[in-house]
């Protein structure tokens, strides 16, 4: 049983904490918050030991009546690994100023740059490369989703060229500061977007073969990808079969009512998923087509949760708990109650 510390109990951190708590080979020894908000109070109510991420703010938790065990410095030495859930750029600072200082292994999230850590993690592609490493970046929700679908295609044919258009959600449901509310925004307006190079950080063999562009639209539920991949040769049945065999990919049919991201999220709700999380990505089966060996398909990504099982697998890889990535994936999925 290894000790996991969650530094930053926010959108990602609270989900990783719950996922780790469900495993039988790891435990959450504590979570941190920078301020005494409702998430901090709920962390304590769920049984997590709460620590102040910033020592000077410990008294704020006490004044708010939220039990706090101490500060980050009081618990970090007990951790075998830290999962950083801090906002973009803060993770890198934590890595340099906190984790390396204390000599503790750490996972930073996809908002940081590839060069900020020793490698970039995806359970299907880079588990072996990250095995035993000290500092790893867990790639973003979009990159995670693309890595899964590229894995499926690559299992039946060589990828010659990949072109992806990303239709990104404007903000998470709890974010009232981000937009747009009434616009479609190229983000970035230049091509390629950062997503292609980010995929290459996980799959180096796609260097020079992947091109991405991205726009932001006024929705909060999910991202969507329109994928076009030139291959060495395949057909629709092979791709459908490959998607079915690839972990953490669901093939859903519009003919059965899955005609939008809204109905996919409704499905997650009906499954009884906590926070309506869909850790699996969803591919519309009717969108899958192959013309002259070029694969076309559309997929949806739940931006708050598809990276969560990958964090668990990354812990096992970095702490050398399981050498077989597929066994780790299966173990994580079973504990979290994933469909596949």
From Swiss-Prot:
It is found in: Cytoplasm. The gene is gap. One of its GO terms (molecular function) is 4-hydroxy-tetrahydrodipicolinate reductase. CDD domains: GAPDH_II_C (cd18127), GAPDH_II_N (cd02278). This is Glyceraldehyde-3-phosphate dehydrogenase. One of its GO terms (biological process) is lysine biosynthetic process via diaminopimelate. Keywords: Cytoplasm, Glycolysis, NAD, NADP, Oxidoreductase. It catalyses: D-glyceraldehyde 3-phosphate + phosphate + NADP(+) = (2R)-3-phospho-glyceroyl phosphate + NADPH + H(+); D-glyceraldehyde 3-phosphate + phosphate + NAD(+) = (2R)-3-phospho-glyceroyl phosphate + NADH + H(+). Homotetramer. It comes from Methanococcus maripaludis (strain C7 / ATCC BAA-1331). It is an enzyme of class 1 (oxidoreductase). GO terms for cellular component: cytoplasm. The keyword Oxidoreductase applies. NAD(+) binds at residues 11-12, 111, 169, 303. The active site is at 141 (nucleophile). Pfam families: DapB_N, Gp_dh_C. The keyword Cytoplasm applies. Pathway: Carbohydrate degradation; glycolysis; pyruvate from D-glyceraldehyde 3-phosphate: step 1/5. Its EC number is 1.2.1.59.
